[in-house]
């Protein structure tokens, strides 16, 4: 990559980070202005268009980055699990760390999941589906269950995790610790339920084949 391309990528990165920094519990992406983001990034508003077509393209890039960041962290968690440790507890801890370190990234996913923009809703749905698919892949590999079972289990787990994540954004450290424990219990109940449901279905098949 040449010097000019590196500088362009650096400026593009600055715009993304500037937009993230302006999000908060009180401020959504829809309330951001191009001028504010450009000023925070240290560039002229007219220079913004060298990097993004419009503010919506910037927002969609932020959604993609947020989803990718979360998936990468969860992959790292699964690598740690491979070396020993509780699958569910390690995953929950990693997820809560992500929210603690990147609250605005998670807020963006939550808000735009049910926002007014169809493009944003589709982008968030796509990221969540990636998340579900990767978890289903892992469960299928580890638990040796059919894809239909692991997808249903993964979808239930992700739904509960995202709901807990929304709650975690606005509570203190002790409440978050209690939330983590509750989330671990809920996910274990889903995992146990999926396993016993699968066992029951297998027993039915075996009985019919006799």
UniProtKB/Swiss-Prot annotation:
Main localisation: cytoplasm
Gene3D superfamilies to which the protein is assigned, alphabetical: Homeodomain-like, Tetracycline Repressor, domain 2
Domain spans labelled HTH tetR-type: 10-70
DNA-binding region, residue intervals: 33-52
Keyword list, A-Z: Cytoplasm, DNA-binding, Fatty acid biosynthesis, Fatty acid metabolism, Lipid biosynthesis, Lipid metabolism, Repressor, Transcription, Transcription regulation
One GO cellular component term: cytoplasm
InterPro entries in alphabetical order: DesT_TetR_C (IPR054129), Homeodomain-like_sf (IPR009057), HTH_TetR (IPR001647), HTH_transcr_repressor_FabR (IPR050692), Tscrpt_reg_HTH_FabR (IPR023764)
Keyword Lipid metabolism appears in the UniProt entry: yes
Pfam families xref list: TetR_C_46, TetR_N
GO aspect biological process, one term: negative regulation of fatty acid biosynthetic process
Compartments where located: Cytoplasm
GO molecular function: DNA binding; DNA-binding transcription factor activity
Xref: PANTHER family: HTH-TYPE TRANSCRIPTIONAL REPRESSOR FABR
Subunit structure: Homodimer.
Protein's job: Represses the transcription of fabB, involved in unsaturated fatty acid (UFA) biosynthesis. By controlling UFA production, FabR directly influences the physical properties of the membrane bilayer.
Listed name of the protein: HTH-type transcriptional repressor FabR
Species of origin: Salmonella paratyphi A (strain AKU_12601)
Organism ancestry: Bacteria, Pseudomonadati, Pseudomonadota, Gammaproteobacteria, Enterobacterales
Annotated gene: fabR
